[in-house]
């Protein structure tokens, strides 16, 4: 049973990456529409997260798992800032997206990625020798431990997501009725991976080497794309 669940998670994650890739292509073809360019970049990063996460789960040795985990961290830490960029663009706050603001928004993710890449040279993040395989509930998968910078990035992620959701809630209240359904769809699309990520982080139902968030982002890609291009 565990092997079937693991295969299903990997398959769902790969499908999520394919869906995000397709949505990125659709966004490119419609890049002149409002907020679609930001949506396209978000989809590119979501696809990268899904594919690298799949590769990490399927890694046969700790060194490969650790390497793919570095790419996972680059993609995952960039997803939330891009969500906020998309929300600001969608709600008509493009004027806030100055180079200074965008640089500040990526300050924490950039620091996190640099500390992750340079982990062999300091003790803030576990190095390559820390990764290994763990068997839990019949599932055997690689596990790469995390350090304090990962916790800081996680807190930053939830703060940025909270800001994005508050901006959408404000826009929902103030917008005309014709846009309210679309805004509700956009908000739902962002809530889906947020809830899944929190469940993965704070509950014991999943294997420590499995993150369901990339698979959930495939659902986000479908819902968000439908919401943007349907209305």
Regions found by a protein language model. Name each.
Residues 1-19, 149-157:
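Hydrophobic transmembrane alpha-helical segments in integral membrane proteins
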Residues 2, 48-75, 89-94, 118-139, ...:
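Helix-loop junctions on the outward
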Residues 6, 10, 36, 40-43, ...:
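Interfacial "cap-and-anchor" motif at the non-cytosolic start of specific transmembrane alpha-helices
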Residues 15-19, 71-82, 156-159, 215-220:
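Membrane-embedded alpha-helical segments of multi-pass membrane proteins
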Residues 20-28, 77-106, 162-169:
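Internal transmembrane alpha-helix with an interfacial aromatic "cap," most often the third helix
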Residues 27-36, 62-66, 90-97, 165-184, ...:
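Transmembrane alpha-helical segments that serve as helix-helix packing and pore/cofactor-lining elements
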Residues 91-150, 182-188:
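The cytoplasmic-loop to transmembrane-helix boundary for the fourth helix
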